[in-house]
Amino acid sequence: YVWESGNTPDIYEVNNMDEFRTGEGESTLAACLNRILKLEGAEDINASTELENGKSPAEILTEATGGEGFDLTGCTPEEIRYTISHETPVIAMLSMDHAVLVIGYTDAKYAYLDPADGERHSATPDEMNGLVSGSGNVFIGYVK
């Protein structure tokens, strides 16, 4: 996986990340992917359609960002900090059908956007570990 602890700042938040909600009939995973596509200027790609056509989230991110999408399953919240610190939010699955977008961190808190309620939330490292443990620590990220 992509992680270098020595090269990770202690505090970081991805720029230009406003709250967002799921659209009509849109999954939280598709909403998170579409928010990343908007951030990367690839709004012409619809994540819901791509997922329905059998593409994985990592494949969608690879095609849309000009970088490389990664399935970071098994990483810890601490390990995804490296990816976030490179101005790329990370999708975290809280369950098989509930995705959130992790956009920042400090030593004491993680910041994430939940498209299910349209709100910004924070969680301590222990809370974040608990939130993602139910999905088996499923994270999806990308590098540019």
Language-model features, listed with the residues they occupy:
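Conserved active-site-adjacent core of cysteine acyl-enzyme catalytic domains
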Residues: 1-25, 29-144
